[in-house]
Amino acid sequence: MGTVPDPLRVTKASIVAASGKEESRGESQSVSPQPAQPDNNASGIGNVPAELSLQLSAAAQALMQACVSESSQQDMASPGVFSEGEPVSPKQKTPDDFLLHGSKESAAPGLNATAQKELISAPCLISVVQHTHHAIQRDAPNTSTCAVPEGSLVKSEANSNGENPEKPGCPARVTCCSSKNQEGLCDFPSPENSQGILQTPDIASPSADRPEGEGQKVINNITAVSSEPPVREGCSENKQPSATALNTTAERSENPPPSHLTSKGATCSSEARQALLPAQYPVSRFKEASTMTCQAESGAKEVSGRAWQDAEVQAVASVESRSVSTSPSILPAYLKENPAPELENGQEQLRVICHGKGSGNHLLELSNSMVDSQESRQCPSIVPQVHIQAATATPAAFKGGCKPANQPAEGLKSPLIHVTSSQNTETEEDLRLSASKEATSRQPEGTNPDFQKANAIGQISLPAGSQAEINQGLWNSGPREPEIVVKTAKDHKAESSCKPSNSGGGANKDYPPESLDPTDKKGAKDKKPASPLIVKDHAPGATSTLDAKTLLLNPKSQVKEGEGPEVSPAPSPGRKSQQNTLEELRQPKTVMSLSLPSDGTGDSSPGSGKRTPSLSVKASPRRGSRVSEFLKELSVTAAAAQVGLTPGEKKKQLGADSKLHLKQSKRVRDVVWDDQGMTWEVYGASLDPESLGVAIQNHLQRQIREHEKIVKTQSGQTRRSISSDSSSSKKLKGRQHGVLQSMLQNFRRPNCCVRPAPSSVLD
């Protein structure tokens, strides 16, 4: 095939194209002079389609004669040619091919003009496709002729374009044509090529109008031409990215071909279509693989995948929340850095939205889209159905209080979503729409919405919300909406009645913060828009469990906890069962809360977003030593969990243990490290890296200090001992020396042997 115009080699490409065009013109002109002009025009980007059709019509006639035999040979030798075509393609792949690669890659757009012309003439596919397309449109006889001319056109154009012996290339083309994907791909590189491709299915269908074998041959020829080794590889590289476009175009053209076929009344149109369709199916598969995009066909699969993602997200969220709770010292910083860790991590909080028409049907909608999560941040009222109002509400929303978006009767429709303000209502509606879309797609997969609602709400939304709350500060009792908590998937009426303001949804505005803020002693502060960190507390449905937790954790907040029960004064039996099911899900939450220090006297500074008195207290650097206490508490909780105690027993035991630990914490050393430098508490605490790192750092610092003290004391003792030893030895030596001296001095010598004074000698 002729070299594709390279932006750098436009001139050379044009020359090559001109030569290829001339050759193709010669052949086509022998048949009819028109093709040459179409080729020239085809070189023009804008004129390509029409001129291609002209060229194809003329070339088709010329090629008909040349390719009639070739097409038949191709039909017979298509398998063998198939293998041949590929070797040939490497052969033809020589400079032109590489040029084609480079030029196509660099100047894929450049193909549009000269390249497309040459590709059209050379990849007969486009030219044949367009030619067949236009020729079929123009001349029915040309269609039949096109089939053969395509083969001949492939030869002539292949010769002219490739300027390489392309007769072997023709078999290669035939072989290539066997894979229509390639032909589409080869033709696709340039936008015009894509146009040609769009027409290619049409052409294929026109060729389908011809006898099946003939049409298929033509298609094969076309594909072979287009997939001529140079074009094939060059185009394949450029076209793989555009394979999707090719698929699209092929599909589009696929639809046109029926029209052409029907208009042409081709005998083999249906068969040709079928042949084209199978060829295109692989294309679609290729598109999926290359683009990593999900086809509409896999919508159901996507739905199921989404549901799975939701469950996984919840599990991850729970792990994160536990890790945070285990390392309370890190919690304040963690909250500051990651106000909504789940949202940041892309863990989408599930909001189960029950759309009830009247108090009857309740569609369960799971919305886990990031947009929804963001909206949930803005609209705390949008709750993951049961207890959790996933995101923190805007301060204004909190101030306004959470009012059920719908009246108690309408509250049943969306008990989950209570919009604090008109803005929230808008976001709520958006969430509903998105959730409804997802729900509609998901519901087919799952069981009836009621069943999904009960299970999903109980299992998924609960963990997500509760752990989200924990992560963001369980006790940041921003205006928690007991309404949502009270709402149960089963009884929406009970939910509406149970809504924090049991008497009326409107009363909830003022009430929820106080009742749901057992931990926070200052209800008014809670009413104030808490910092975005504030996560709505445990669902009102779980208020009983929350009360128990708070009693265990914050005995001082018991008075307020009394308020909490008000949230669910008349839990419906459905909600009770849901609470029972949820208790198990909340057990990790209880463990986490228990692990947190049970100091009711938390520093709940009104401004601090993390109104977790105990958390803030323990998190304060002054109480870094409390980490060990937390670890011990965690170990107690973990041991209780392992023992398999029922939630109530576990709570009791944990509460007692935590109290004992608090009493003993002063006497107990922070952490007892074994030979390996780890303790069972650390192992069993399921600490996240941050908390574990903090504990290890504290421990190491402590050890270093102790070691330094020991070293100092030992060094002081050794110095003293050394000094004493040296002094004593010196004294002893001096004494001995003095004795000898005295003896010598006292020793009477003869006068002749009198020696100078020993002092002079010694000195």
Curated annotation (Swiss-Prot):
Residues 93-104, 480-496, 518-539 have a biased composition (Basic and acidic residues). The keyword Phosphoprotein applies. One of its GO terms (biological process) is vitamin D receptor signaling pathway. It comes from the Eukaryota. The modification Phosphoserine is found at residues 323, 359. Residues 27-44, 237-250, 437-450 have a biased composition (Polar residues). GO terms for cellular component: synapse. Keywords: Phosphoprotein. Residues 1-48, 65-111, 192-268, 420-452, 471-624, 711-737 are annotated as: Disordered. InterPro entries: GPRIN2-like/GPRIN3 (IPR026646), GRIN_C (IPR032745). Residues 593-609 have a biased composition (Low complexity). May be involved in neurite outgrowth. This is G protein-regulated inducer of neurite outgrowth 3.
